[in-house]
């Protein structure tokens, strides 16, 4: 009888502890995973958001860099995490919207909760400042005229495929090098190992320093800090590459954890200092925050990229 009572008491205490743990979320440090190397613009965004969200939630938030395969390595690890709110991705959406149409993945893109979008990373194609071209079109013309292959370092699958399609259109042989994030692209371009590269808003400080130049804005419009450089479409290429960054969690996120994370995100969305950090400090573009908009954006991008992939077959 004593043993049965002890066992029952133990189960009751365990249940009570489990309930308290869920209701008191967070009770321990949280991890923000990101798919780029330290120092990359999305890494800086993740660290800035981690500090601000930590102040709201009352627990430390550590940043873990999980690089490789354009974000799919990080997405795989995140998909295998418990949906308890202690592992959250701060990542480009391409691993969930673009990659599923072009590679066999170890995860289902439907196995995630998309909590909110946080920023649109300003992005473009760059070259070393002393290269004899000032636009991407001129770069291809130069390589075509001199019968040379172009070496390009890419950031993700979408910009890789965009530059591949452009090279095919121009009739220029392309040699592709994968990267682990913006800093590695900058290093390759300035070191003369790549003729062109694709990066996010990290490009601004290097353009200002004079080590690189922007040769094509990759978004739908020109980048305001460098307004004289035309977009891909303005250079005659029907291409656009957008690096939208969001907060992502494993599917089936604990309800209390989800509510508190969404509430914290809502506070950040309405905080002028956070907006200044994203748009003024990081020079990223503002987006609409919120779970509904994130879900809609992911669905629309997934469908768009699916149709694009089908048309290419």
Put a short name on every predicted segment:
Residues 37-39, 93, 128-133, 154-158, ...:
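Short coil/turn segments
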Residues 27, 54-58, 224, 234-243, ...:
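A short C-terminal helix-loop "cap" of Rossmann-like NAD(P)-dependent dehydrogenase/epimerase domains
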Residues 108-118, 153, 173-177, 195, ...:
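Short beta-strand->loop
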Residues 46, 203, 294-298:
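Hydrophobic packing residues in well-ordered alpha-helices of helical domains and bundles
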Residues 22-111, 146-148, 158-159, 168-198, ...:
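N-terminal (or domain-start) structured segment
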Residues 53, 77-86, 100-184, 242-278:
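Hinge/capping helix and adjacent helix->loop/strand transition within the periplasmic-binding protein
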Residues 1-27:
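Short, low-complexity disordered leader/linker segments with a strong preference
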Residues 27-29, 169, 255-313:
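An extracytoplasmic/periplasmic, membrane-proximal ligand-sensing/linker region
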């Amino acid at each position: 009888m004593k043993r049965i009572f002890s066992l029952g008491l133990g189960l009751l205490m365990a249940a009570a502890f489990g309930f308290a743990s869920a209701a008191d979320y967070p009770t321990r440090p949280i991890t923000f995973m990101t798919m780029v190397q330290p120092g990359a613009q999305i890494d800086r965004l993740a660290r800035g958001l981690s500090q601000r969200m930590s102040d709201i939630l009352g627990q430390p938030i550590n940043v873990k860099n999980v690089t490789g395969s354009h974000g799919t390595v990080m997405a795989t690890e995140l998909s295998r995490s418990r949906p308890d709110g202690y592992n959250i991705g701060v990542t480009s959406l391409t691993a969930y919207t673009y990659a599923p149409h072009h590679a066999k993945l170890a995860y289902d893109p439907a196995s995630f909760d998309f909590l909110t979008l946080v920023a649109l990373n300003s992005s473009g194609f760059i070259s070393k400042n002393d290269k004899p071209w000032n636009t991407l079109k001129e770069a291809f013309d130069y390589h075509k005229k001199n019968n040379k292959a172009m070496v390009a370092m890419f950031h993700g699958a979408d910009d890789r495929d965009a530059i591949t399609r452009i090279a095919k259109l121009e009739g220029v042989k392309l040699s592709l090098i994968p990267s682990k994030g913006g800093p590695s692209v900058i290093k390759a371009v300035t070191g003369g190992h790549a003729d062109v590269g694709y990066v996010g808003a990290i490009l601004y400080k290097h353009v200002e320093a004079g080590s690189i130049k922007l040769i094509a804005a990759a978004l739908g419009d020109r980048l305001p800090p460098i307004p004289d450089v035309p977009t891909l479409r303005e250079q005659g290429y029907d291409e656009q590459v957008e690096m939208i960054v969001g907060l992502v969690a494993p599917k089936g996120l604990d309800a209390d954890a989800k509510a508190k994370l969404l509430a914290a995100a809502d506070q950040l969305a309405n905080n002028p200092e956070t907006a200044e950090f994203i748009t003024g400090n990081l020079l990223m573009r503002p987006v609409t925050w919120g779970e509904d908009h994130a879900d809609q954006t992911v669905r629309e991008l997934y469908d768009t990229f699916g149709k694009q992939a089908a048309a290419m077959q």
